[in-house]
Amino acid sequence: MVYIIKKDGTKEEFDAQKIVRAVNKSAQRILYTFSQQEIDFICKFATEHVYSLGKTEIPISDMHNIVEGALEKVNPAVAKSYRDYRNYKTDFIHMMDEVYTKSQSIRYIGDKSNANTDSALVATKRSLIFNELNKELYRKFFMNRNELQACKDGYIYIHDQSARLDTMNCCLFDVGNVLKGGFEMGNVWYNEPKTLDTAFDVMGDIVLSTAAQQYGGFTVPEVDKILAPYAQKSYDYYVKEFLKYTDASWEGAQEKAIEYAIDKVRRECDQGWQGIEYKLNTVGSSRGDYPFVTVTLGLGTSMFEKMISISLLEVHKNGQGKKGHKKPVLFPKIVFLYDKAIHGEGGIAEDVFEAGLDCSSKTMYPDWLSMSGEGYIAEMYKKYKRVISPMGCRAFLSPWYERGGMEPADENDKPVFVGRFNIGAVSLHLPMILAKSRSENRDFHEVLDFYLEMIRDLHKRTYDYLGEMRASTNPLAYCEGGFYGGHLKPSDKIRPLLKPMTASFGITALNELQELYNGKSLVEDGQFALDTLKYINDKVAEFKKEDGILYAIYGTPAESLCGLQIEQFRKQYGIVRNVSDRPYVSNSFHCHVTEDITPIQKQDLEGRFWELCNGGKIQYVRYPVGYNKGAIKTLIKRAMELGYYEGVNLSLAYCDDCGHQELDMDVCPVCGSKNLTKIDRMNGYLSYSRVHGDTRLNEAKMAEIAERKSM
């Protein structure tokens, strides 16, 4: 008889079935199920090793080591789960103490790591505290020691740790597919809308409900084409309504009916967009933030498609709020899909372009995405007439073909973009990696490869983990057709839907990488940064081919990360001139914000990296106060020829006391008030840099905004 000596000194007879229960719990924690053959092997392995020791009493620590040995042979991931759980009581106390400390800070000080959250609100505080717990659980039960150390030191950054194991990142949601024929949401059946105003209401419900089930940006692609059929239904209704009360003998009744119907539909458009803007900027999602929603538009050329686009642009330009104090809202972010053939001089939708230009010159939005210029995004549109809208502020999907998957089956195969999503991003801190290679006298590419492989492994495990989720976790997406192939049963696992989805390798601080390499900025040189980005592309292409996973290169929009990476660099390598001597690092491949260069120079300099970040990118230039609409138009058209996704940067300011509006204002020149609302570009999206004198932004980002010259 063999006895196991437990931690408290008591004895317990050895029983292989207790091992089965313990390893099954460890497997369940990573959503794995053992086969009977694997269970039999574990029991046999453990029993043989126990009796081979020739002892009648075995300490529990030795028993744990035996079980770990069995699990390492069957499934190393379960072995890690078992190992992590062994000392969970001690670890859990430390973890909860850490969460409690952070929760007190959130409750009484607030949190400015995400400009899209208002941490003064109770619901937001609760969400932020839960996120801290979820983040600790992710680190404890998903990450290995090397990954934890790499994150702690700052060589990599795993985005959205608080939600990565619950759901997916950003998406192009197929709202049109969900609306068609009706759908079920929250156990209630929604009929397909019969009018435009109802379509707006239902679309708003869909967005608020579904955006809360993910953690990244939520895009409604080509919204003008989605809503146009419902505008037609409203139009038909209003024509019939008018004629119903018209005498047949009235001259011009039909023309009057058409005029009446068009006016009524336009009013539905205006009120619908106003409702959407109010809903998205005042009703927080269940995540505790305001849903980060983007709509793309502009390619529709029918009367109602153009009306829907122009209506949103004019509603956004005019702003929301009380009379004399109107200001533009932050959501939805608007992206204009520009095609020179229809938006150029004399084009069928030139009026839509002019409305967009007028809106951009006053509110910064819309941003502009070229469908007719150079490069990957435009080529997909020109060849297939398929639009790659940005997911959220800047993420773009790789092509996935209807029949061939990663590669077209034949010349007739077409790519699918709408309904797809990204499963998460992990970013490289390139200056840190170069500094490490130098401090250890190792080849830079050798060290870089180590972290690229680390990110690769994280993505593969994330795919496996998410694949075990059930469709019921996001029913509108997985069961009602919001995602590509999303007609599963609630009890089905979502693994079959993951193949066409992307996973991102992010890059930050390319400018600081070049500075650390030879003391020159991207403006002065940039060749080493360019070579590094090409190398990363080549390696990720190899991973993609070997793993059958759509990996993508992403120009990371560092928000709070821009300050964190400086802190991490200084801790390891100190303060280095033009690398870590400011409170922030540069975003992705952008020139440093303090560079005194023209908008055209900035467009050209950043263009070197454009096609090397096809998984996520944006180009923007800052316009001085004296810039007029004509200058903005010239630069937008130039960006469209170059194939860019272009943003207009202005520093908008509004006096909350007298209503005066002026660019770059810190004190109102009319009434002397400092009670201002200021809107600046955070990264790819806009944010309040001041609200009633306070800011939602972190100190590092505010320092960056203060130094902007050419951003």
Task: Annotate each PLM feature.
Residues 1-107, 701-706, 711:
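Charged, amphipathic alpha-helical regulatory modules used
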Residues 13-14, 500-504:
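Short, conserved micro-motifs enriched in small and acidic residues
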Residues 15, 33, 666, 684-685:
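Conformational switch/transducer regions in large eukaryotic molecular machines and scaffolds
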Residues 24, 47, 456, 460, ...:
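Amphipathic, well-packed alpha-helical segments that form the structural scaffold of globular domains
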Residues 92, 98-499, 520-522, 526-681, ...:
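Conserved catalytic cores of very large enzyme subunits
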Residues 503-516, 534:
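Contiguous, well-ordered alpha-helical segments that form the cores/surfaces of helical PPI scaffolds
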Residues 691-700:
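Conserved helix-adjacent loop modules within structured domains
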